[in-house]
Amino acid sequence: MARTDTDSWDLASSVGATATMVAAARAIASTEPNALIDDPYAADLVRKVGLEFFTKLVDGDIALDGDDAAAAGLMVSMMAVRTRFFDDFFCDAAGAGIRQSVILAAGLDSRAYRLGWPAGTVVYEIDQPRVIEAKTAAMAEIGASPTAERRTVAVDLRDDWPAALRAAGFDAATPTAWIAEGLLVYLPPEAQDRLFDNITALSARGSRLATEYHPDITSTLRGRGQAMSERWRDHGFDVDLSDLWYGGDRNAADEYLAGHGWQVSTRPRPEVFAAYGRTFPDLTLTGDDNAAMRQSVAITATRS
């Protein structure tokens, strides 16, 4: 179903289901030899959501072969590197003395529970109310305890989330570490700019931001999402990923941030893979455009 300006979701539908998909990838990546990440909660969170395809995937109860196996392997590889990149970003920010962090569109992100946060750190998680409620309940049932002071902000990012964040105790005078992981493709172009404007307005000097940017969203990612959805529909996952992503001309995230008071650093995706000792996968195995996907970049920025 195509997106609307007022659509909402839980963790088993629409955009929320992609959070479950990513958690499934983290769960599998955590069990690999020489794993890049360790997310001990991902598999249990996926099971709590109850989407049969992803539950079977993390439990090893589904046999994938050919293109299906290649697509799943690609997803796991991509998510392992992406997760580690954002993990390291938070750890580096904490090492620099930042004690206030914000996870935008937190989904099933478990960093507030699994990273070794310094004493006194506050982690804010922002997402839709049903998503926040479900994850909080699931973590309690699992018996997980946050490793930082976790504060939830149950609000749609299309609403006045800065006001809700402040109401939860956020201090705009204190440097903050922000992540927008896997988020920008789910925003219309103007909403992406508005997100960065709000982050900038809330960021004291020395604040840090990490995100990722895909220059060719329309022709590459939407086609990739449609192909992946078609493969997985046969296994019972009936969400068309290509319907969830917004195309259209948009400002390059790195250039926009640089023009709004941030010192920006970018790394192409293959370079990020290499930094973690991994080889960027051959995307032609799943019908993707290698050249276009190699142009996607990981962004880190510091408020000047």
From Swiss-Prot:
Annotated S-adenosyl-L-methionine binding sites: 127, 156-157
Organism: Mycolicibacterium smegmatis (strain ATCC 700084 / mc(2)155)
NCBIfam families cross-referenced by the UniProt entry: mthyl_TIGR00027
EC number of the protein: 2.1.1.-
Function: Exhibits S-adenosyl-L-methionine-dependent methyltransferase activity.
Family: Belongs to the UPF0677 family.
Keywords: Methyltransferase, S-adenosyl-L-methionine, Transferase
The protein, known as: Putative S-adenosyl-L-methionine-dependent methyltransferase MSMEG_1481/MSMEI_1445
Enzyme class: transferase
